[in-house]
Design a protein with these regions (language model features):
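Beta-hairpin "wing" of winged helix-turn-helix
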Residues: 60-61
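Short, amphipathic alpha-helical interaction segments positioned at domain boundaries
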Residues: 66-98
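Basic amphipathic alpha-helical segments that dock to polyanions
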Residues: 43-55
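N-terminal intrinsically disordered, cationic/polar leader segments
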Residues: 18, 29-32, 50, 107, ...
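Short amphipathic alpha-helical interface segments
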Residues: 2-34
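Membrane-inserting effector segments that mediate pore formation, membrane fusion
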Residues: 89-129
Length: 129
């Protein structure tokens, strides 16, 4: 399965919205409560696993053959990545650059997002040539 960057972003946004000290993100196969209705169950499972392996989410537990997945929270790197890509215009720019470069891996997307934000900060302060 190919990585869908939009699915990753939607998972991270959903986890951030739900998780706190009292609540975990509980995903069930037939649950349409979150902003994940555009993705198949297989896509969601795959992308949750990719987020876990990339260190973006933590305390992930799989139950009943992955028909129920519990996510404890975003990891610090997940918070940072999401903060960098929250704004839709930034996210669209990150995806555009990734397509031009020819790589949409999570590590590349994370690096591009950080660089885009750095360039926006420089532009804000008039530091770009």
């Amino acid at each position: 399965m190919r990585l869908n960057p939009d699915c990753v972003r939607d998972i991270l946004l959903s986890v951030e919205e739900i998780c706190d000290y009292h609540n975990v993100f509980d995903y069930y196969e037939n649950n349409t409560e979150f902003n994940l209705a555009n993705y198949s169950h297989e896509e969601i499972i795959y992308h949750i696993k990719q987020c876990e392996l990339s260190g973006l989410i933590m305390n992930v537990r799989y139950y009943d053959g992955a028909t129920h997945i519990c996510i404890g929270d975003l990891a610090p790197s997940g918070h940072q990545f999401l903060a960098n890509i929250r704004k839709a215009t930034v996210w669209n720019g990150v995806k555009y650059i990734a397509e031009k470069v020819g790589s949409t891996s999570l590590s590349v997307l994370t690096q591009i997002a950080a660089n885009v934000v750095t360039e926006l900060i420089k532009a804000q302060f008039g530091l770009t040539p």
